[in-house]
A protein has these predicted regions:
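Catalytic cores of enzyme domains
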Residues: 1-152
Length: 152
């Protein structure tokens, strides 16, 4: 964990995000990131890859359409992975990339408590994890991101 986590200002990359403070999985948090990481003896890193057809890779998207498409695609896959990991490792904390995928609408902006406090998976990035470096170092994957109007 120490190789990929910067605790100097863990949520620095999150502040410019429009979701900052809108989801229970996004900062600011009540518990410092260092305290959260201190609760782990081991970390298992799993990832997912998406493979697109040549036609999809050539397709030009409206930027908003592309953002919505990739959000839906990753959210559904993340929900499936989350459920599988929770079945495989009962009681383990499951951290995610990006935001939470458990609910269609988060209760945080409404000032209400989380509906699933035992199941919420905080964002790795928000806890100071350099996900790109971890993917490269532990999985041998280079992360690719959509461009303005095309899939990577």
């Amino acid at each position: 964990v120490q190789r990929y986590v910067d605790l100097a200002d863990p949520a620095a990359g999150c502040r410019p995000c429009p979701d900052y403070g809108r989801y229970w999985t996004c900062p600011p948090y009540d518990v410092p990131a260092a305290d959260y990481w201190a609760g782990f003896d081991t970390v298992l890193l799993e990832g997912m890859q998406f493979h697109f057809t040549p036609a999809m890779l050539e397709r030009r998207f409206d930027p908003e359409e592309l953002a919505e498409y990739t959000r839906r695609l990753t959210a559904e896959q993340a929900r499936q992975m989350d459920r599988a990991l929770r079945r495989q490792y009962p009681g383990a904390a499951v951290l995610t990339t990006g935001g939470c995928t458990l609910c269609e609408e988060c209760t945080r902006p409404m000032g209400r408590p989380c509906r699933h406090p035992q199941a919420v998976g905080y964002s790795l990035e928000s806890l100071g994890c350099d996900v790109g470096a971890a993917a490269r170092g532990e999985l041998g994957w280079e992360l690719l991101w959509p461009r303005r109007d095309k899939l990577p």
